[in-house]
Each structure stands twice: as C-alpha cells, then as structure tokens.
Amino acid sequence: MNNSGSALKDILVLGAGQLGMAVLRALAPRARTSALSVTALVSPDTINDPSVQDRAKLAELRALGIDVMGFDLASDEHALTELFRNYKTVLNCSGFVAGPGTQMKITRAVLAANVARYFPWQFGVDYDVVGRNSGHPVFDEQYDVRQLLRSQLSTEWVIVSTGMFTSFLFEPAFDVVDLERGTLHGLGSWDTKVTVTIPRTLAG
C-alpha cells in the first residue's frame, strides 16, 4: 500500500485510445456513483497541440467528469514512479505505442510506487499460453511482466484476458498480418489459436 501522507486519488487510466476510451466511457458512470475520482493520462501533445479529433476526445472526457493529465510514458522510470504514487489504482490501456520495454518499465514503476491495485496491459493474448521465445519480442515482454508481478506480494494485480483486438492483427508492430507483403506469421507456432474481440465489448 502506498504510504504517502497526502490524500491519494482513486483511479489513473493510462491511455485514451481505442481501448482507453471504451474503458473510460464504461468506468465514468460507475465511478461517479461510488464517488471515485478518475484521471485519464494522455500524451502532452494531445493537450498542448490537439487535433480536431483530440479536441472532441478531451471534450467528451471532461463531460464524463474525468480529469485529464498530459504525461509522456516515455519518461524515465523515476518520473513514472513519482506519478503513480498519487493513485490507489492504475489501469494500463496504453498499448504498445511507446515502444519496446515500456510495459516492463511501467510495471516496475507501479511496484516501486506501492500502488495498491494494478491492471497491466495484458488485454487480449494469454501470454502464459504463448510463453516466452514466441518469436515476437512484444509478447515476450508481456510474459516477463506477468513473471515480475508474480514475484511480489505488495501490489494486487488483475489480468483481463479476452482475446486479441481484431485491429491489432493488422498493426505493423505486431507483424502478424502483413497486407503489403501478403504474409501471415503464426504466434509461436501454427498450432497457436487466436481469439479476437473488440474494445467496446471488453469495456461493456
């Protein structure tokens, strides 16, 4: 448990993208009923130099009663730890946009901050089934996140495995379906089955 002397805020949601917005829309009315505070973390550019789409998103979040904070997840681990110290629960909807190593860095910072409850970015693939040495470094990192969480007892953690998001199959970073080259890569082996879902189903 975080022992900070100041009053802790309730819930910090990392990311307001495809999944983050679906989660925030579902979470806001429930949090309001329970008098819980919700903060959405977005990139600084979303606030400082918003696109038309960003402006609409920010307006929706504020209408939902959600506080919005600009913060770069590419920041160093210490900065992340200091941020997370202010919250009881961190819900990670950041995805892989910040690059390799980010999910491990976020997880280490959550643990260092003694956050009471953490929902890691583990939506979709069951990384225990895929295992390590899957051929996809992003998946290997996610497996390592699980091992790190299991190695400690201070922070409660919850994994929500629902099936991979359909759109991610076609993301270049995942290297599963490459439409330009007309290639398809198996996850670990051709015997690995894939279940897909959409974010609004997960958050509903």
Model-derived segments and their meaning:
Residues N2-S37, L41-S43, I47-Q53, V125-G204:
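Oxidoreductase cofactor-interface core, primarily capturing Rossmann-like NAD(P)-dependent enzymes
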Residues D10, K88-T89, R117:
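Structural motif
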Residues T39, M69, L91, F119, ...:
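Hydrophobic/aromatic beta-strand patches that form the interior of the parallel beta-sheet core
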Residues V42, S94, Q122:
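A cross-domain feature marking catalytic cores of carbohydrate-active enzymes
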Residues I47-A113, D128-G131:
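NAD(P)H-binding glycine-rich loop region in Rossmannoid oxidoreductase-like domains
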Residues A74, V97, F123, T162-G163:
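Residue-level "edge-of-site" marker
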Residues A113-A116, D140:
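Conserved internal alpha-helix in NAD(P)-dependent oxidoreductase domains
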Residues A116-Q122:
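Short beta-strand elements of ligand-binding domains
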